[in-house]
From Swiss-Prot:
Residues 65-270 form the Laminin G-like domain. This is Thrombospondin-1. Pfam families: TSP_1 (PF00090), TSP_3 (PF02412), TSP_C (PF05735), VWC (PF00093). One of its GO terms (biological process) is response to calcium ion. Residues 379-429, 435-490, 492-547 form the TSP type-1 domain. It is found in: Secreted; Cell surface; Secreted, Extracellular space, Extracellular matrix; Endoplasmic reticulum. Residues 839-934 are annotated as: Disordered. The keyword Endoplasmic reticulum applies. Residues 1-18 form the signal peptide. Changing residue 1067 to K: Loss of N-glycosylation site. Residues 958-1170 form the TSP C-terminal domain. Residues 47-95 are annotated as: Heparin-binding. It comes from Homo sapiens.
Length: 1170
């Protein structure tokens, strides 16, 4: 019954198992891309090489274009699997060439119009880029610090679920990434009909360069199982924090909160219905009858086998030539044949005779093989004589010779090896002198031996002719010998020396020990005989009586091994780990003292506790994370040191940012350590984010924010027009930017000369289009309303413009506060506003708008940071911001003690604030003097956009320098800039010549973002922003045109501007003017003026009344530049990494060219590490 039941279960398992997800590559749970493309077979485009996994092939990619795509039917299976799982696991091992950019996988459209999806390893930027194209829009998500292009083998595990992505490199978890669209919106049902899957093939210059192995899509398992199988530690499970929130009411297909494969219902596992199960039960009942019959048959066979086994147990016998022999018995048939009995089988073998190294070998009577015998004959051992040589002379007396060879191994070979005789052919003419000449060489003699190594010999005579009449004798040797080789001579084996006796099996009472020897002196070779005798030998040892065990009294320290000797003495072994001593007395070792870095050192404290025995490390300090080692002994402490790393909530998933927000890590010294910032298209406090249509940082609807409830949580008072300041003069809930009558005086703002002051009469005494009610100089024409000292009295009518107490007519800096009126160069312009304070230049001419007068401007800048060498506080180290916190004339970038407190920067816990006492009350590594305010500018670090620069704490363009780029001519006006939101929003209102509004803050590495909006249907030209500004001839510009158009003036050069976003570097040899104007309009390169670094290949222009959000990242140290432009929540254009080191930083600003009503809103800049 048990057998029948077991067979039934096996049958059921077999039926159900047909629908399991196997782990091999022949199902839809694992898709090996190389195998599917046929690349695993020999072919062009790749070369088979050795990889880290010896069980599968690795390929060096030589030409990815020649590697075929995945077949459509297999690709369709993959698409179905991705859609069913709502994600995938991508595994790959790669060795990518250093600093290269290469595509691992790509879904390429069959019509060659682009890619639907790609995974690209960007070695230049150190990122893994995921590019998705949905409804014609490209979305790029980058996983930062993915250092794959190192020339070393790396293993990646990419886990994509819905709109989330998680990357592991080897066993290390990278930062979470969020896709802009769910992955299943890319892997549509009809994807296989419009696209194909390619490996290593990307766009132009994006093919993978290096070696790939085990590129596979995996389904039906978890990242934790994959990483565990790779040998990653179990702590990896703690890092699996990818959000698996319920989407549209359904749970994700790939889960990360359990171990093992995902659970499926019975129907999904077995794939059979209840009716089929009922039918199977009936069949099993029939099977039971058959099995019962089989049991009876097996029982009968068992009995027969027992009888047969009894027969086989009888001692085996052999019969040979009618004689019976016992098992293992040996006998000799004749002198050349020996036999033995083995398990009833007679085995006979012929004796193999070696080759004899002599010519007189004979077979003795009663033996099988011949022997060499010594001989008394003088000719024994010699080979036969060779033939006589030719006569050595053609005339006169000559000689002939012949030779023979000796077998010197077995014979004495008495006698000569050469015989000589005279010969005479004819008489010679002796009347003249002649030199001697050699005769021909004699034939070579036979080899001197019949086996092994011997020699052969030949001779010649100086008689062809013989020297006469004082002729010269022959030169050279008369005899020549060389080696000859016969078959190797047989060598009989000889015993080597006995080995020492091994250790006796007991220490007393009589034991056994043995020794052995080898047949290797010499080893039998070339048919020689084996050694005769035994290989091993035994003898009795330690016959004396056993003494009393001295270890029975436990004389050693607990845990120490005790060794007893025959004479009753004993010996203790080494002390246990964690102790030191002689084994009898052991004392605890202080591992914390012996290994001073065994545990984490924090603020000079070694966080280690010594125990008896062993030690343990204290937990990592607050805001740090790491292991807590413990153990025993110095060796353990040295090999298992504690490592505590600063905790980063943004990467370990412990932050509470909204899913539509980005987590920005501020450092482990900040409290809190991170800041949440809503992504483009959303607004709020980062914990709660709501829709933001106009991208000005304010949500469309009120949000219920817990803390600081009014900050960017209040409903946008102009939801369709950017107004980051939310100004509302009449408090009617409609922002000034979209309120047609802000002051409610019944006069529309576009005709109101005081739109923010109630003045229905519209009086304007000075006719400057600014009404008397709001005119800061009502009797002086001043449409710009400039008010330098912000006292309410305009500059046009103020007696003291800068408010320094010195009247304008006596003030040498009318627009700059300078009570001392110092004027070093006596040019009438005070030092505070003099662009050449040490050189006389009353005209203050500054042709290149770099704030250095032409008189003292030499433009010599070796480090390209925008500050000429004689004015640069670090002339050989780029530091565009010129930060100098101790005001010692040496910039922080090249100053080893930035705060001049006597503590070197690398040891100072407040690098920018003097604190010689280095007091740190909470022991977090940040001194009390700069706690929560590193640069001591009274702005908390969490709110400070440049926490390491006391001169910059918030974004502010209220003060800016206007730079005209085409100052000559009257075809258009200069730009007109309106400042709002305390300098965080600017509006350019007129159709104008190219111009800039450049702020005065200077930056090294910087992030710059803002909202771009064209609030008119008129015109279709350029607007954008500048960065790295150093002068009007040297800057980077990002500019955007709506439609393709040629510039109306073709002089001095023809300029064709294409629609789309461009990134350009300006290095003009002429400066502002018509050359630079046309070069800026032109999309492309203009020698001596402008070079285009990148232009949007899709040529997408801006749209009227549409909000866009840009994000710029500039890292001058590496030359990294990246510009991303969002339209709403989606990325509209992405330059990707651009590298250019023309300028090492500078100022930021805004750019317009022939375009009116350009809104630059919610401007933000932030200092970044280089």
């Amino acid at each position: 019954m048990g057998l029948a039941w077991g067979l039934g279960v096996l049958f059921l398992m077999h039926v159900c198992g047909t629908n399991r997800i196997p782990e091999s590559g022949g199902d839809n749970s694992v898709f090996d891309i190389f195998e599917l493309t046929g690349a695993a077979r020999k072919g062009s485009g790749r070369r088979l090489v050795k990889g880290p996994d010896p069980s599968s092939p690795a390929f060096r990619i030589e030409d990815a274009n020649l590697i075929p795509p995945v077949p459509d039917d297999k690709f369709q299976d993959l698409v179905d699997a991705v859609r069913a799982e709502k994600g995938f696991l991508l595994l790959a091992s790669l060795r990518q060439m250093k600093k290269t950019r290469g595509t691992l996988l790509a879904l390429e459209r069959k019509d060659h119009s682009g890619q639907v999806f790609s995974v690209v390893s960007n070695g230049k930027a150190g990122t893994l880029d995921l590019s998705l194209t949905v409804q014609g829009k490209q979305h790029v998500v980058s996983v930062e610090e993915a250092l794959l292009a190192t020339g070393q083998w790396k293993s990646i595990t990419l886990f994509v679920q819905e709109d989330r992505a998680q990357l592991y490199i080897d066993c290390e978890k990278m930062e979470n990434a969020e896709l802009d669209v769910p992955i299943q919106s890319v892997f549509t049902r009809d994807l296989a009909s419009i696209a194909r899957l390619r490996i290593a093939k990307g766009g132009v210059n994006d093919n993978f360069q290096g070696v790939l192995q085990n590129v596979r899509f995996v389904f039906g398992t978890t990242p934790e199982d994959i990483l565990r199988n790779k040998g990653c530690s179990s702590s990896t499970s703690v890092l699996l924090t990818l959000d698996n929130n319920v989407v549209n009411g359904s749970s994700p297909a790939i889960r990360t909160n359990y171990i093992g494969h995902k659970t499926k219902d019975l129907q999904a596992i077995c794939g059979i219905s209840c009716d089929e199960l009922s039918s199977m039960v009936l069949e099993l009942r029939g099977l039971r009858t058959i099995v019962t019959t089989l049991q009876d048959s097996i029982r009968k066979v068992t009995e027969e086998n027992k009888e047969l086994a009894n027969e086989l147990r009888r001692p085996p016998l052999c019969y040979h030539n009618g004689v019976q022999y016992r098992n293992n018995e040996e006998w000799t048939v004749d002198s050349c044949t020996e036999c033995h009995c083995q398990n009833s089988v007679t085995i006979c073998k012929k004796v193999s005779c070696p080759i004899m190294p002599c010519s007189n070998a004979t077979v003795p009577d009663g033996e099988c093989c011949p022997r060499c015998w010594p001989s008394d004959s003088a000719d024994d051992g010699w080979s036969p004589w060779s033939e006589w040589t030719s006569c050595s002379t053609s005339c006169g007396n000559g000689i002939q010779q012949r030779g023979r060879s000796c077998d010197s191994l077995n014979n004495r070979c008495e006698g000569s090896s050469v015989q000589t005789r005279t010969c005479h052919i004819q008489e010679c003419d002796k009347r003249f002198k002649q030199d001697g000449g050699w005769s021909h060489w004699s034939p070579w003699s036979s080899c001197s031996v019949t086996c092994g190594d011997g020699v052969i010999t030949r001779i010649r005579l100086c008689n062809s002719p013989s020297p006469q009449m004082n002729g010269k004798p022959c030169e050279g040797e008369a005899r020549e010998t060389k080696a000859c080789k016969k078959d190797a001579c047989p060598i009989n084996g000889g015993w080597g020396p006995w080995s020492p006796w091994d250790i006796c099996s007991v220490t007393c009472g009589g034991g056994v020990q043995k020794r052995s020897r080898l047949c290797n002196n010499p080893t039998p070779q070339f048919g020689g005989k084996d050694c005769v005798g035994d290989v091993t030998e035994n003898q009795i040892c330690n016959k004396q009586d056993c003494p009393i065990d001295g270890c029975l009294s436990n004389p050693c320290f607990a845990g120490v091994k005790c060794t007893s000797y025959p004479d009753g003495s004993w010996k203790c072994g080494a002390c246990p780990p964690g102790y030191s001593g002689n084994g009898i007395q052991c004392t605890d070792v202080d591992e914390c003292k012996e290994v001073p870095d065994a545990c984490f050192n924090h603020n000079g404290e070694h966080r280690c506790e010594n125990t008896d025995p062993g030690y343990n490390c204290l937990p990592c300090p607050p805001r740090f994370t790491g292991s807590q080692p413990f153990g025993q002994g110095v060796e353990h402490a040295t090999a298992n040191k504690q490592v505590c790393k600063p905790r980063n909530p943004c990467t370990d998933g412990t932050h509470d940012c909204n899913k539509n927000a980005k987590c920005n890590y501020l450092g482990h010294y900040s409290d809190p350590m991170y800041r949440c910032e809503c992504k483009p298209g959303y607004a709020g406090n980062g914990i709660i984010c709501g829709e933001d249509t106009d991208l000005d940082g304010w949500p469309n609807e009120n949000l219920v924010c817990v803390a600081n409830a009014t900050y960017h949580c209040k409903k946008d008072n102009c939801p369709n027009l950017p107004n980051s300041g939310q100004e509302d003069y009449d408090k009617d809930g409609i922002g000034d930017a979209c309120d047609d009558d802000d002051d409610n005086d019944k006069i529309p703002d576009d005709r109101d000369n005081c739109p923010f002051h109630y003045n229905p009469a519209q009086y304007d005494y000075d006719r400057d289009d600014v009404g008397d009610r709001c005119d800061n100089c009502p009797y002086n024409h001043n449409p710009d309303q400039a008010d330098t000292d912000n006292n309410g009295e305009g500059d046009a009518c103020a007696a003291d413009i800068d408010g320094d107490g010195i009247l304008n007519e006596r003030d040498n800096c009318q627009y700059v506060y300078n009570v001392d009126q110092r004027d070093t160069d006596m040019d009438g312009v005070g030092d505070q506003c003099d662009n050449c304070p040490l050189e006389h230049n009353p005209d203050q001419l500054d042709s290149d708008s770099d704030r250095i007068g032409d008189t003292c401007d030499n433009n010599q800048d070796i480090d390209e940071d925008g500050h000429q060498n004689n004015l640069d506080n670090c002339p050989y180290v780029p530091n565009a911001n010129q930060a100098d916190h101790d005001k010692d004339g040496k910039g922080d970038a090249c100053d080893h003690d930035d705060d001049n407190d006597g503590i070197p920067d690398d040891k100072d816990n407040c690098r920018l604030v003097p604190n010689p006492d280095q007091k740190d009350s909470d022991g977090d590594g940040r001194g009390d003097a700069c706690k929560d305010d590193f640069d001591h500018d009274s702005v908390p670090d969490i709110d400070d956009i440049c926490p390491e620069n006391v001169d910059i704490s918030e974004t502010d363009f209220r003060r800016f320098q206007m730079i005209p780029l085409d100052p000559k001519g009257t075809s258009q006006n200069d730009p007109n800039w309106v400042v709002r939101h305390q300098g965080k929003e600017l509006v350019q209102t007129v159709n104008c010549d190219p111009g800039l509004a450049v702020g005065y803050d200077e930056f090294n590495a910087v992030d710059f973002s803002g909202t771009f909006f064209i609030n008119t249907e008129r015109d279709d030209d350029y607007a954008g922003f500048v960065f790295g500004y150093q002068s009007s001839s040297r800057f980077y510009v990002v500019m955007w045109k709506q439609v393709t158009q040629s510039y109306w003036d073709t002089n001095p050069t023809r300029a064709q501007g294409y629609s789309g976003l461009s990134v350009k570097v300006v290095n003009s040899t002429t400066g502002p003017g018509e050359h630079l104007r046309n070069a800026l309009w032109h999309t492309g390169n203009t020698p001596g003026q402008v070079r285009t670094l990148w232009h949007d290949p899709r040529h997408i222009g801006w749209k009227d009344f549409t909000a866009y959000r840009w994000r710029l990242s500039h890292r001058p140290k590496t030359g990294f530049i990246r510009v991303v432009m969002y339209e709403g929540k989606k990325i509209m254009a992405d330059s990707g990494p651009i590298y250019d080191k023309t300028y090492a930083g500078g100022r930021l600003g805004l750019f317009v060219f022939s375009q009116e009503m350009v809104f630059f809103s919610d401007l933000k800049y932030e200092c970044r590490d280089p």
